[in-house]
Amino acid sequence: VVLLGERPAEDGTDHVGIDNVRAAREATEHLLSRGRRRIAVVGGMVRGRQGTDRLRTDGYREALAAAGVPFDADLVVPVDAYHWRDGARAAAALMDRKARPDALLCLNDHLALGALRALYERGSAVPGDLDVVGFDDIEASRFSVPSLTTVAPDKREIARVAVSLLLERIEGADSGPMPPVRDHSVGHRLVVRESTGG
């Protein structure tokens, strides 16, 4: 078995994904470069297991620290699930606060698309009042209004490496001990679109 994308926990299987800390740091740096300082993390986690949500929150915190922006735990908003409705609920709750964010770093595109809808319904301009960034570069991110700035994993490389690892496991099954579990990171890029002024 080879896991692709997000690893739920250390489970003894090969894994291929991106460097989530670095990717979130770069996405946060992009928001900071646009003058955003009250950046909320939708789907984030401050404490707990070392899953994707925690790794991406760590990258966000690194970028804030490097820019001299104080970390505010109230801007890290956990969600029940990574679906559109959860992103919409989180964005609505953030906009009901007295001290509103000026940007949302959503830990996947589904959350970001839900957030965009909630912001639209409240009359908030994106990218004017807030910037929004997602993760994964799903197809809908290109067609939303505004189109969504997102972290795009190198999906072709993920597939290539995963097939290679799987074939090594299959071919090695009859020839002796299995190689140790491998964790392989592939590249990513920030795709700047309309939700951050692109």
Predicted regions and their residues:
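Bacterial carbohydrate/catabolite-sensing allosteric modules
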Residues: 1-3, 7-198
